[in-house]
């Protein structure tokens, strides 16, 4: 089961790289920096937690710090990515870099869950908007499914399941969520996202 944790991390990492390549020429340096830093944070957080589970399963050690940093790093990462991709649509892009302000470290999980939901929601909403502009409404359903799966995974990951079957369900939901995200982004790319001109449309 520990190895399965790396599958959604890999899916998200591939999806993030594809988006970074396709959106690079559509973002200002500041917006792209926020988006890139956010997606890197999310990928690293997932990889570190998966590594913690693998080390624990193999009986090597219980490196709790890898698990403890998951929520703060991932939630702030989603928020930064969401702000960066939203800025691409809502603000006139310039060459100047943006200043990223993040909240101080907090021990509770409620704040981080809120940040994660907000950032992930913004990111999926912008992807739905892009799908609509490319006249591919079917992709909107894919991104909505990905968002719903991510919300379910967020709830499931906060529960303490004694049965292995429930952990497998949580892993399955996570794989489906990140898999649909990757599928949607690949289809956006296939349908011309890389060549889509956001600035020209706004100017018209």
What are these regions (language model features)?
Residues 47:
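Conserved phosphate-interacting/catalytic interface
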Residues 1-40, 50, 54-69, 76-204:
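Polytopic alpha-helical membrane-helix bundles and their juxtamembrane interface segments
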């Amino acid at each position: 089961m520990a190895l399965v944790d790396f599958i959604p991390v890999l899916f998200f990492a591939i999806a993030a790289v594809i988006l970074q390549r396709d959106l690079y020429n559509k973002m200002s340096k500041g917006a792209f920096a926020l988006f890139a830093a956010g997606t890197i944070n999310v990928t690293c957080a997932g990889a570190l937690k998966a590594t913690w589970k693998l080390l624990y399963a193999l009986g090597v050690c219980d490196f709790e710090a890898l698990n403890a940093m998951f929520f703060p790093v991932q939630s702030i990462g989603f928020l930064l990515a969401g702000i960066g991709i939203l800025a691409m649509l809502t603000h006139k892009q310039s060459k100047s870099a943006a200043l990223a302000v993040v909240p101080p470290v907090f021990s509770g999980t409620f704040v981080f869950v809120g940040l994660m939901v907000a950032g992930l929601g913004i990111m999926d909403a912008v992807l739905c908007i892009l799908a609509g502009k490319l006249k591919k409404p079917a992709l909107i359903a894919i991104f909505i499914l990905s968002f719903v799966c991510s919300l379910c995974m967020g709830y499931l990951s906060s529960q303490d399941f004694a049965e292995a079957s429930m952990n497998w369900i949580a892993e399955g939901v996570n794989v489906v969520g990140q898999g649909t995200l990757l599928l949607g982004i690949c289809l956006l790319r296939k349908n011309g996202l890389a060549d889509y001109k956001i600035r020209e449309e706004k100017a018209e």
